[in-house]
């Protein structure tokens, strides 16, 4: 039963697993929202709305903070690996619990 839940996260279109065991999360980010939240899908990416402006890296910092809380992963284990200046971003999550990750993502 536990093995099946580990495969749930793999089947999400916006989530990929690296050989290293880290996960890549493909996101579409919308800054300047009233609050930070997961907001469904945007094409093949998970949409995240952020309560921060896209200035001076504030939205990127808020994205890491929000994902850390939402996914219960330490901030040091979350890095934006692509799209620092774009709305389409790839976030690398190092050593998450696959069951917890699957339970917290839509």
Where are the model-predicted features located?
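Contiguous, often N-terminal, cationic amphipathic patches that form binding interfaces
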Residues: 1-64, 70-75, 79-84, 89-106
């Amino acid at each position: 039963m536990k093995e099946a839940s580990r495969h749930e996260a793999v089947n999400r279109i916006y989530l990929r697993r690296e050989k290293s065991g880290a996960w890549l999360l493909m996101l579409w980010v919308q800054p300047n929202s009233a609050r930070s939240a997961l907001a469904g899908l945007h094409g093949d990416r998970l949409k995240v709305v952020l309560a921060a402006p896209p200035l001076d890296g504030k939205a990127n910092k808020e994205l890491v903070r929000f994902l850390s809380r939402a996914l219960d992963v330490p901030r040091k284990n979350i890095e934006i690996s692509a799209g620092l200046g774009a709305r389409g971003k790839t976030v690398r999550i190092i050593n998450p619990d696959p069951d917890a990750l699957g339970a917290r993502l839509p």
